[in-house]
Amino acid sequence: MSRNVVITSAVRTPIGAYGRSLSGISPCELATLVAIEAIARAKVLPQDIDQTIFGHVLHTEPRDMYLSRVAAIGAGVPDTAPALTVNRLCGSGLQAVL
């Protein structure tokens, strides 16, 4: 069975200097915010999403290892949908798309 896969939306987290304005916001919180925004821009319902993939490099707390899962659940994606966090250093975002 073949299926067409489409990217309906993309949102990037902000970039800041180490220890500055974004230091009080965890990577999982940022990921949840961009997941919510990507879903809104795509005009789809969270329950219609069947997979979530995030690129992420530097873990600052234990739940960052599950960043994609944390963001998906926080954005209302069903817990039955797989979630994958990719760590390919500088290529993480691109690898997540592929």
PLM regions with names:
Residues 28-43, 67-71, 96:
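Short, well-ordered amphipathic alpha-helical segments that serve as non-catalytic structural scaffolds
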Residues 21, 25, 29, 33, ...:
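Active-site loop-to-helix "anion-binding N-cap" substructures in soluble metabolic enzymes
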Residues 1-26, 37:
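Condensing-enzyme catalytic core mediating Claisen C-C bond formation in acyl metabolism
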Residues 52, 56-98:
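Conserved catalytic cysteine-centered active-site region
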